[in-house]
């Protein structure tokens, strides 16, 4: 059942362009480039995380985020090439420097899945599985197609869809294939035939 939830606005609660929405059992989370806003499922404002800056406990921007099982907020700053984990009390718990220019993230078991699009990297892959404990990439998937990388620069904000704690769907703009990604594999879930017009 779909439910329409109206979120409040005021002079002290003005959300910029929304780039991501996540929901949990009890809360709705909305982010723009600088803050993550938390609301109840009924739309009542709870709090916001705003740590934008250049200090040791701050992030430069929010490119993507998710909320883990412990209600910790993970923030990706593509500009800084870093991941930040903040507690439910907005305290920085961890930061991880990345070797790739990630633009989207998704939790996958005890790891984090990174999507880099067609940005070339040492592995020349689009998906990278980051080990949270060590802060290192332990596996990469889906080779970058060099010809597509020359012209296909359109970025979509919604490349991941969670299936379970250990599996998610992955799809790209202008791509005819939807993949299932697990911590140890990637497989084709669906392929669409556009009658000869596939890119």
Where are these regions (language model features)?
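A short helix->beta-strand "capping" segment at the edge of beta-propeller domains
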Residues: 1-16
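Asp-box/WD-like beta-propeller blade repeats and closely related beta-sheet repeat scaffolds
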Residues: 60-63, 76-126, 136-152
């Amino acid at each position: 059942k779909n439910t329409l939830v109206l979120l409040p606005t005021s002079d002290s609660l003005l959300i910029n362009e929304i780039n991501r929405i996540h929901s949990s059992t009890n809360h709705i989370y909305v982010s723009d480039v600088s803050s993550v806003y938390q609301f109840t499922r009924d739309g009542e404002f709870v709090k916001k995380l705003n740590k934008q800056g250049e200090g040791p406990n701050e992030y430069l921007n929010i490119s993507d985020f998710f909320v883990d099982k412990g209600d910790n907020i993970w923030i990706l700053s593509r500009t800084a090439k870093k991941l930040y984990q903040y507690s439910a009390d907005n305290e920085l718990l961890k930061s991880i420097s990345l070797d790739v220019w990630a633009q989207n993230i998704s939790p996958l078991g005890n790891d984090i899945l990174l999507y880099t699009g067609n940005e070339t990297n040492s592995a020349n892959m689009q998906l990278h599985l980051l080990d949270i404990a060590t802060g290192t990439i332990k596996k990469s998937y889906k080779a970058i197609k060099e010809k597509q990388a020359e012209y296909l620069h359109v970025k979509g904000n919604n490349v991941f869809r969670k299936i379970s704690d250990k599996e998610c769907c992955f799809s790209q703009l202008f791509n005819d294939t939807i993949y299932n990604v697990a911590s140890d594999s990637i497989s084709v879930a669906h392929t669409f035939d556009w009658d000869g017009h596939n890119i």
